A protein has these predicted regions:
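Membrane-interfacial helix-loop segments of redox and metal-homeostasis proteins
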Residues: 1-217
Length: 217
């Protein structure tokens, strides 16, 4: 690809990402879509509404992703998550630290960006610290600690670490077909679970589930 065409494509991708992020932020702000808020509502009040929003969004994203993979528009095997080594300790420690930071920072990364757009100065400070910490964990001093500790613990799997890899290996069908089948079962199940509750059937809840899931696609 010539440099001129590559530059033009880069600009298109950046503008598309900007527009999608604007839509994502607007929907999040309008519907109060929030991962930490969903968990907090369930634990504190027994209210599953925002958790159902989250479940529907995941279901829509799963189905859309599998359709793109089945059609050949994307290659899931090239994702950084499609590895043959399962870093289970890294996932546990990282998940715990993410959850802890989400509570202390009053929201995850996406919610922090939405709050910055609303003029929240605390969110701006959280965003700066989060950016520095993330970069350090990828390529800085904490990356050395990460590689020397949690990433030394893992399990090598011949068929890959994703459910699609396992299903394809067990059934003998192509990975794209296995992925499509799994997404329809799991993703469709999540959408059904979310929408079966009568109290959930409100336009804003559907906007959150379908809109956020669509933005992810």
């Amino acid at each position: 690809m010539q440099s001129t065409a590559l530059s033009a494509l880069t600009v298109q991708v950046l503008w598309a990402g900007f527009l999608v992020s604007m839509v994502f932020g607007a929907i999040t702000q309008r519907t109060r879509f929030c991962t930490m808020g969903a968990i907090s509502d369930v634990v504190s009040y027994g209210d599953w509404t925002r958790m159902r929003q989250w479940g529907m969004a995941v279901g829509v994203a799963m189905i859309g992703f599998s359709i793109l993979a089945y059609g050949g528009w994307i290659n899931p095997a090239k994702s950084i998550y499609a590895s043959t080594r399962w870093l289970w300790l890294s996932a546990l420690v990282g998940g715990f630290l993410f959850g802890l930071g989400m509570v202390l920072g009053s929201g995850c990364g996406s919610k922090t960006l939405v709050r910055i757009g609303s003029g929240n100065l605390k969110a701006f400070v959280v965003f700066l610290v989060m950016g520095v910490a993330a970069f350090a964990t990828l390529k800085g001093i904490t990356a050395v600690v990460r590689v020397a500790t949690v990433e030394r613990v893992g399990i090598e799997l011949s068929q890959g670490t994703t459910l699609t890899d396992w299903a394809a290996s067990a059934s003998g069908v192509p990975a794209t077909v296995a992925g499509m089948a799994l997404s329809m079962v799991i993703g469709g199940g999540l959408i059904f679970w979310a929408s079966r509750e009568r109290s959930f059937r409100h336009p804003e809840n559907y906007l959150a589930g379908l809109g956020i899931g669509g933005a992810v696609i």
